[in-house]
Amino acid sequence: MDKIKVGLLFGGRSGEHEVSINSARSILQAFNYPENLDKYAVIPFYIDKNGCWHSAATARQILTSGQPLAIESNIKVNIWQFPPEVREMEVWFPILHGPNGEDGTLQGLLTLMRVAFVGSGVLGSCLGMDKIAMKTAFAAAGLPQVKYKAITRSQVWSNPCVFPQLCDQIAEEIGYPCFIKPANLGSSVGISKARNRQELEAALDSAASYDRRIIVEAGVTAREIECAVLGNDNPQASLVGEITFDSDFYDYETKYTDGRSSMVIPANIPDKIANQVREMAVEAFKAVDAAGLSRVDFFYVENTGEVLINEINTLPGFTNFSMYPQLWKATGLEFDKLVDKLVQLALERQEK
């Protein structure tokens, strides 16, 4: 039987480039398990920080070294020149995190190519990336969440007379403490916590430097709970896990510094709460029209028993130590079987 040709696509132009490389290395290892070797011929492709696609030879060098390709940022490049092997792929496994990878742009390209790919389509990816659109979808589905306010860069930078009024509105509608986030960045990039007016002004200015769309959320004292979802039209939820950390909040530095955070699987929470989280995770998956895989993050307010949805990540980190594969491992689905299942889900969705 001919092997299915899988294009493993990693790298990308976002700030999560190195995370993508690590995810791809783990996925390639999973494809090297005997059962997967018999079914799939995996060809890696690398997108550098300029957006250029590189062939399997370069991609393998990057995966071996674990280091991104050194490039000159000021040179003009032809981003439309794809390696010739691209047209031979039967299914793609994109593992690009952040903008230009999991925001619907790449998914649109693969859809135009009329080829199967792992993960959500254009709509699910867009909604899963933009926190404002995501929260609108969650609200429409009746999922409880913290108070939030959507604003734009122009409100922050354009008119110095309007900015103080904006800060007054945030203080009145959301209150302190609050979190200020760029709407379209992942891995907690650009997030700030504001406890007072001075910190709010600085946080808004910082977020505006990252994105033209900004979201302000009410702070809440809660445990951070996560659940993995797998499937297409009939998705299944994993066991529930918890993220614990030693900082004021779960920012980029805490997330990617060894020893600053840890995972607890399964989370030490009541069964009733765990079941509620799993049900809400599936509802969130459907609310954004996700496909294949997603990790859904929640706040569990222990003193009231409330479960509030935080966000959905339609292309979560995929290293051996990432929460998504670890949740499925604890549920009984090993890494190599998970990778196989995701490819099969992609092929099934393409057939429909």
Swiss-Prot record:
The keyword Manganese applies. This is D-alanine--D-alanine ligase. Signal peptide: none annotated. Pfam families: Dala_Dala_lig_C, Dala_Dala_lig_N. Mg(2+) 2 binds at E311, N313. Its main location: cytoplasm. The gene is ddl. SUPFAM superfamilies: Glutathione synthetase ATP-binding domain-like, PreATP-grasp domain. Mg(2+) 1 binds at D297, E311. One of its GO terms (biological process) is peptidoglycan biosynthetic process. Keywords: ATP-binding, Cell shape, Cell wall biogenesis/degradation, Cytoplasm, Ligase, Magnesium, Manganese, Metal-binding, Nucleotide-binding, Peptidoglycan synthesis. Its cofactor is Mg(2+); Mn(2+). Cell wall formation.
